[in-house]
Amino acid sequence: MSSQEASKMLRTYNIAWWGNNYYDVNELGHISVCPDPDVPEARVDLAELVKAREAQGQRLPALFCFPQILQHRLRSINAAFKRARESYGYNGDYFLVYPIKVNQHRRVIESLIHSGEPLGLEAGSKAELMAVLAHAGMTRSVIVCNGYKDREYIRLALVGEKMGHKVYLVIEKMSEIAIVLEEAERLNVVPRLGVRARLASQGSGKWQSSGGEKSKFGLAATQVLQLVEILRAAGHLESLQLLHFHLGSQMANIRDIATGVRESARFYVELHKLGVNIQCFDVGGGLGVDYEGTRSQSDCSVNYGLNEYANNIIWAIGDACEENGLPHPTVITESGRAVTAHHTVLVSNIIGVERNEYTEATPPAEDAARPLQSMWETWLEMHETGNRRSLREWLHDSQMDLHDIHIGYSSGTFNLQERAWAEQLYLNMCHEVQKQLDPSNRAHRPIIDELQERMADKIYVNFSLFQSMPDAWGIDQLFPVMPLEGLNKSPERRAVLLDITCDSDGAIDHYVDGDGIATTMPMPEYDPENPPMLGFFMVGAYQEILGNMHNLFGDTEAVDVFVFPDGSVEVELSDEGDTVADMLQYVQLDPNTLLTQFRDQVKNTGLDDALQQQFLEEFEAGLYGYTYLEDE
């Protein structure tokens, strides 16, 4: 692939920015993965890897997970805060506390724990706390307990403290403190407490309601004062050691982060004035990732990098401490998305393509009705004059005629052949107009976008949007999507991607397209009979755990991929994926009962025994097969 072609492809899909040096296009026009950019020789051709796995029986769709990316993300964030602390003379420590709600899979938690980097864990429920406590012996670090808490949750956290772990119970509701003090006395343990302050500062974007005065969690200023007095009266003021706030997930604008940290730093100062020895400053989540690669303030991008993020936090806290003569606290961030998003790619196969093809135009019958004649006259005029200023007018005239023909068809004025002729001529018109439009002409941009959407290939992909990318459906989250191969060809086609659920919402509506977002996906020319595999990137945060079972499509298979400098690759199956039986059991449909009921029906058909046996074997094989489409 020439450098010019490679450059164009990188710009089209913006992979140079959202790929973050983990993903690239190689000289064959294939996606390559480098799990550790500090070791550039350790990389793998993803297209070839998937083909090799398929030859060994790998089913698609499947998640290809790269634990080494997780570890590199953790090292990168820790390094950014180390540089910031050194740059500003900050004396406090820093810990990244991983909120396991982002991805609770064992492979994620243990890959991070075994990275050799300092790491804490955060839980937001009883189940998560049990997972965290069980792994706490591997980290000997910090545990932060957030979320709503009942007596059992609080007892579990205090048991962890009694066992020698640093467990911070963050008070988010005033009702929690009485239970904490009661259970601490019962267990004879000094609780280690935090308080979540509800800030006036609020970020922007899809998760802005996580912060601000109307946020679901946290204590208002009055309640913070009440908490201090309750603890003082109980003789437990020294237990309050951590200050926590949260502006929201995926903060796009660094100014919002800086504003929130400055406000929360005032809480740190004021609490010290009240005699509260706050030792840890937990700024929560918010560190975003650039799904678009546009480096902007849009909801799916960020206008800052790791160094700027760390610098703003360390400077704001350090400045408040210096101004008021206070010690530098340990800084904690709960940066789950930034750690996990990049490490997982969903790979799937295309199962069908529907194209709007150009065909040779033929005139209507001489006695054809006026709308048909009008469409043909417009077609001839466009070919005879070639006047670009009339392109929009010609397209609009054809649209009006086609609209009249559709109405006439419903009333019986036009027959099926006439409707088909009109629709095909309109497609031809769109093809011709599209060829003559100039993307550099701003006046042409709206009509180019309209035609790209109208003429795009419909590509049916073997996956469930609701299971594998629920945020794309639920909140219009954008995820980068690319073919894994054929990227040494110019992206001449446009496409929309549709899943295999029986739901019209099962479609991807937005795609990365250069420095912007489009409603269609750029695609290189491809053979519809042998289409490329597709990769859905940056799905490592939230998607696996939020995925739902629409149409009873289950978890996909998942593999962990390890890449080494000598070019060797190790692949481990980490999740076999759900069978049909698994999904049926989840909705209380027992597979054995279903098989018995089906067997009884087959017996009553009167078919010969061999055919009955064939039907039973096919039903049973389906029960214990993959929930997604499989080739014979």
From Swiss-Prot:
Residue numbers binding substrate: F281, D282, V283, G284, G285, G286, L287, G288, V289, D290, Y291
Recorded catalytic activity of this chain's protein: L-arginine + H(+) = agmatine + CO2
EC number: 4.1.1.19
First-level EC class: lyase
Molecular functions per Gene Ontology: arginine decarboxylase activity; metal ion binding
Any GO BP: spermidine biosynthetic process
Needed cofactors: Mg(2+); pyridoxal 5'-phosphate
Modified residues (N6-(pyridoxal phosphate)lysine): K101
InterPro entries: Ala_racemase/Decarboxylase_C, Arg_decarb_HB, Arg_decarbox_C, Arg_decrbxlase, De-COase2_CS, De-COase2_N, De-COase2_pyr-phos_BS, Orn/DAP/Arg_de-COase
Pathway recorded for this protein: Amine and polyamine biosynthesis; agmatine biosynthesis; agmatine from L-arginine: step 1/1
Alphabetic keyword roster: Decarboxylase, Lyase, Magnesium, Metal-binding, Polyamine biosynthesis, Putrescine biosynthesis, Pyridoxal phosphate, Spermidine biosynthesis
SUPFAM superfamilies per UniProt: Alanine racemase C-terminal domain-like (SSF50621), PLP-binding barrel (SSF51419)
Family of this protein: Belongs to the Orn/Lys/Arg decarboxylase class-II family. SpeA subfamily.
Main function: Catalyzes the biosynthesis of agmatine from arginine.
Name the UniProt record assigns to this protein: Biosynthetic arginine decarboxylase
Protein's organism: Klebsiella pneumoniae (strain 342)
Source organism phylogeny: Bacteria, Pseudomonadati, Pseudomonadota, Gammaproteobacteria, Enterobacterales
